[in-house]
Swiss-Prot record:
GO MF annotation, one: ATP binding
EC number: 2.4.2.17
GO process terms (BP): L-histidine biosynthetic process
Keywords recorded for this protein, A-Z: Amino-acid biosynthesis, ATP-binding, Cytoplasm, Glycosyltransferase, Histidine biosynthesis, Nucleotide-binding, Transferase
Intracellular or extracellular location(s): Cytoplasm
SUPFAM superfamilies: Periplasmic binding protein-like II (SSF53850)
Name the UniProt record assigns to this protein: ATP phosphoribosyltransferase
Pfam assignment, any one: HisG
Self-association state and partner proteins as the record states: Heteromultimer composed of HisG and HisZ subunits.
Amino acid sequence: MLTVALPKGALLKDSIRLLQSVGLDFSAFLDSGNRQLQIQDPTQTAQGLLVRAQDVPVYVEYGQAQLGIVGFDVLQEKKPQVAQFADLGFGHCRMSVAVPSQSPYRSAMELPPNCRVASKFVHCAHDFFSKIDLPVEIIPLYGSVELGPITGMSEAIVDLVSTGRTLKENGLIELDCLYDSTARLIAHPLSYRLNQYNLEHWLNEISKNSQPLAAKAS
């Protein structure tokens, strides 16, 4: 049976809506009383796994799920061995460098060498600062990253930004955008090559039905 890994959190509702448009219904995951992490759709065509967003590519890479929906930010951070098929056009956000608004810096290039940068996206932050040839100390934080500069533990942060409201409320401003992120459709490479569970059909249908979402978002 086809298995689809779905991300908990902000992408879940749109992911389920998209899958419903191709005949796969996992809306039971949206029921506030639901405690199941694995369910079958009513047609018994596929099963869904409800997992943390960071774990979606892990389940797909190891073949426990043939399909997955996950943010581009997760793919950039984890660099999993999966096949990427489509930009699904929802879940828009951006990975940015931010500093306190009273900071003298107005570009990441202006940050002092060996300064401290807090982030839960350690690899993305490291790659960015390596690219601009600025040595920094990356401090891994997995809660409220904004507290890094507020408490003086770091001069800057690298984090996902959607509306910018959280940054503003905490006295931070964006300096640079590393990349834009949206939801992506991924697949297990071998399953795709073998067309297991009619995988090519589902990839084509999901990709095709995502186009109206992408057009609406733009």
